[in-house]
Every structure is written in structure tokens, then in C-alpha cells.
């Protein structure tokens, strides 16, 4: 874990119900990362999307040339330096990424479709409406636009396939048992021996289905600023937000800018908030920092100085990557360079995801 409060983080990811909210409130009062950068309660709320819709933003293909930061980071170890490190060149193909985090409303609609149509998708966790809802219950008017939480990486893999089948047909499902066994993964609990089948998921990027972003895709979308050099550094042909700042912020993490773009423990009132209330980043993406941590596809690994194309992470690792910070944690956890990981069967009231897919 990259923070000095690593035990608190591990605890938070397993917290349930009122206990999580009480402890989060105490931490927010006692350990607020930067007391003067809370920002407003949120920028103007964007127009409400149509029922259950999920908007995507187009990301053009790019080649990113890694750069070593010449400015201070929240910590000294490599987990603060992101994936575009000095000596590494990353080529990304075009992709689409969700404008918002996946809401509980959308999550639940797919679960209901699965049940109503006997599609056979099996989840280890039913999901929760934000940080304080009832697991698996019907969405409420007040909380349906909050991010889904309490879902594991394995749940996300299976749900992505279910959503793909619902919207595009089962043939476009991304996550398969292996490159040679193209069985669609439908069961977050299934094992072969002692190994969960989902943990060996093969991502068929030739399909058009919904999926988790790779870590490189996530970070590029969080940091992209085009030719705008404000609070950014040139990485080859593109400017990327500095590693010590939140996504969309115009200054580093310990300034008021963090509170303008992110919900964290200094302004969240110890809970999640409806997606899209904070100012978007340069690509029009909301909540890339704060509100909930977001799962990525990759196994966590040390980043090597090499040339790679569309990297998907290591073949195995200590845990699956999650990025971005959350309502429960500190302003410095919202920085776009921070990397962390946890077991793929973990879940928490501050852990969710957003979607990606290849056009």
C-alpha cells in the first residue's frame, strides 16, 4: 500500500454499513489531507442522462513517451509515478471510456435483466447503491445515480459480459476463459481446483463488448490535456496532467483545486455522491479522482522501462489494480499518478468502476 494509513485502507475496503460511515467520519475530521482545499459542494450538476444510459468519450490512439517528474510527489516510492515512466513508450489504440462511473441504477438493471431472462450470470456480490444503500435492493430515487460499490473485480468482469450480451449480443463479450477456450465468463464464483476461473480471464480486444479499462487507458484518460500546458508536462506529442494533481485539477493535490474536481474525505461528508457533480477533466470525464476508487483490468506489477503496445499488465500479481481515490480517503490519494492493488475478490463501500470498449 502506498499510503501511511495502509491499515485503514485495507479496513475500509471491507467495511459494511453504518460502521464504515462512522469510522469514515472520524477519519475525515481527524486526518483530513489538506484542510483548506475542500472546494465547493460541487459544480453545477450536468443535465440528467436518459434512463439507464451510459455515455462514452472517444479517445484517439496515441504514443506516450514517458517522463520522470521534476516536481514533488506525495510519496517517494514508485507507486506515485504512474505507468508512463521515463524510458517507457506506450502506444495505445483508439478506445472509448465512460464519462461517469457506473451507477447503481445501471448495475441493477443488468442484474434484473439477468434474473428475468434466466441468462445464468452469477455474482459473488449484489452491489450497493453508493456507500450507504442496501445491497441488491431496487434503486431509490435519491441514490440511483450514485456509483455502485461493494463489488469485486470478478463481479465486474462477469457484469461487463452480461451488459455486453444485453446490449450487443453474447458474441461481442470480451472476457473469455482463455485464448483457446473462448467460453464466455459468466460466474464470479466458479473455480477450477483452488483457482477462480475469472482470475485467468482472457480479454479478447477484437470484440466490441464492454470491459474494464486497462491501467494505461485509465491513466491516459485521467491525465490527457491535449496541447494545454497548464499544470501539465509534455509526454511526446501530448500534455498530461502532473502526477501530483487530481484529474482535471489546475494545481497540485494540497490546494483548493482538488476539492473542485473530487470527492474525498475533506469534503464528502463521509459518503458517495451522485456521479458527475464535480468539474470534468479535459476530456469531459467526471470523478476520475475521488468519489470511488475504480477497478482496472491489470494485475499489479512494477512498471518496466520498455516499449509496449496496448499493455494489459502482468500475467499474475499480488492483486488487481485500482486507481483514483475515494470519498473515504485523503486528497493525496486522488492524484493521477497513484497506483494501488487489492485481491480480485475484495470489495468496499468506496470501490467501483467505469467502462471502456474498443470501437
Protein language model regions, located:
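N-terminal secretory signal peptides that target proteins for export/translocation
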Residues: 1-13
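Short, compositionally biased
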Residues: 2, 21-114, 153-193, 223-229, ...
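Structural recognition of the beta-strand scaffold that forms the well-ordered cores
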Residues: 57-58, 96-101, 147-150, 211-213, ...
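Short, flexible loop/turn elements at secondary-structure junctions
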Residues: 60-63, 96, 101, 152-155, ...
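Surface-exposed recognition segments
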Residues: 88, 238, 248, 271, ...
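Active-site microenvironments of metalloenzymes and redox enzymes
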Residues: 91-258, 301
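Proline-centered structural pivot motif
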Residues: 115-123, 257, 261-263, 310-311, ...
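Short, well-ordered junction/capping motifs at the entry into regular secondary structure
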Residues: 197-205, 253-289, 340-343
Amino acid at each position: 500500500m502506498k499510503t501511511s494509513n495502509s491499515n485503514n485502507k485495507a479496513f475500509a475496503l471491507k467495511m459494511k454499513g453504518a460502521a464504515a460511515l462512522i469510522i469514515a467520519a472520524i477519519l475525515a475530521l481527524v486526518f483530513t489531507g489538506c484542510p483548506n482545499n475542500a472546494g465547493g459542494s460541487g459544480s453545477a450538476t450536468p443535465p440528467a442522462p436518459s434512463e439507464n444510459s451510459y455515455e462514452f468519450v472517444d479517445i484517439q490512439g496515441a504514443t506516450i513517451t514517458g517522463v520522470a517528474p521534476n516536481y514533488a510527489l506525495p510519496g517517494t516510492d514508485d507507486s506515485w509515478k504512474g505507468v508512463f515512466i521515463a524510458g517507457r513508450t506506450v502506444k495505445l489504440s483508439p478506445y472509448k471510456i465512460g464519462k461517469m462511473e457506473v451507477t447503481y441504477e445501471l448495475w441493477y438493471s443488468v442484474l434484473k435483466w439477468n434474473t428475468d431472462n434466466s441468462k445464468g450470470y452469477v455474482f459473488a456480490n449484489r452491489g450497493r447503491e453508493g456507500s450507504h444503500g442496501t445491497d441488491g435492493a431496487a434503486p431509490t430515487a435519491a441514490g440511483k445515480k450514485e456509483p455502485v460499490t461493494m463489488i469485486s473485480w470478478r463481479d465486474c468482469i462477469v457484469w461487463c459480459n452480461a451488459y455486453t450480451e444485453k446490449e450487443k449480443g453474447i458474441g461481442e463479450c470480451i472476457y473469455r476463459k482463455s485464448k483457446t477456450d473462448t467460453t464466455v465468463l459468466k460466474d464470479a464464483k466458479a473455480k477450477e481446483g483452488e483457482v477462480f476461473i475469472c482470475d485467468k480471464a482472457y480479454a479478447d480486444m477484437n470484440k466490441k463488448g464492454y470491459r474494464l479499462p486497462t491501467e494505461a487507458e485509465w491513466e491516459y484518460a485521467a491525465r490527457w490535456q491535449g496541447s494545454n500546458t497548464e499544470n501539465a508536462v509534455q509526454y511526446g506529442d501530448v500534455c498530461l496532467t502532473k502526477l501530483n494533481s487530481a484529474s482535471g485539477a489546475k494545481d497540485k493535490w494540497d490546494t483548493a483545486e482538488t476539492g473542485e474536481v473530487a470527492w474525498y474525505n475533506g469534503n464528502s461528508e463521509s459518503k458517495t455522491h451522485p456521479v458527475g457533480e464535480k468539474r470534468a477533466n479535459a476530456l469531459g470525464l467526471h470523478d476520475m479522482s475521488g468519489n470511488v476508487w475504480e477497478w482496472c483490468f491489470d494485475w499489479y506489477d512494477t512498471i518496466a522501462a520498455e516499449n509496449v503496445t496496448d499493455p494489459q499488465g502482468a500475467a499474475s500479481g499480488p492483486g488487481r489494480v485500482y486507481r483514483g481515490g475515494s470519498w473515504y480517503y485523503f486528497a493525496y490519494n486522488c492524484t493521477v499518478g497513484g497506483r494501488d492493488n487489492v485481491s480480485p475478490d475484495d470489495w468496499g463501500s468506496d470501490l467501483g468502476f467505469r467502462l471502456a470498449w474498443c470501437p
